[in-house]
Amino acid sequence: MGLLEEPRYIIKNTCNNFYEMPENTIREKTFCCGSGAGLGADENLEMRLRGGFPRANAVKYVQERHGVNMLACICAIDKAAFPPLLDYWVPEVGVCGVHELLGNALIMEGETERTTNLRGEALADEAVDDIR
């Protein structure tokens, strides 16, 4: 795809905390979720869990080291494929799209203080502080 630095630029310039997974698991060396090849169906869940283990292991590394609680994906297929994988391997980490992360981080002029994110989920007190 070639979108390697642009999503990172957006996240680094709009969100308070950004942590890269280990260098040997990102950019050109990233592990594909495999769902683009038709493995996204539920009947392939066992294969998806095994195939998603390398990415889940990289997420677990940054979760344990930095307390990461969200994986932001630029790929819509990853955004759909990773929730069941992370629920199994790293249940402390959620999945969102870069666009959603940006939308939650933006505060428009005249906007009233939000109590929910773009999904309508309640914001934790510390999350409100992090966004602002």
Model-derived features with residue positions:
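Iron-sulfur cluster-binding electron-transfer modules in prokaryotic oxidoreductases
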Residues: 1-132
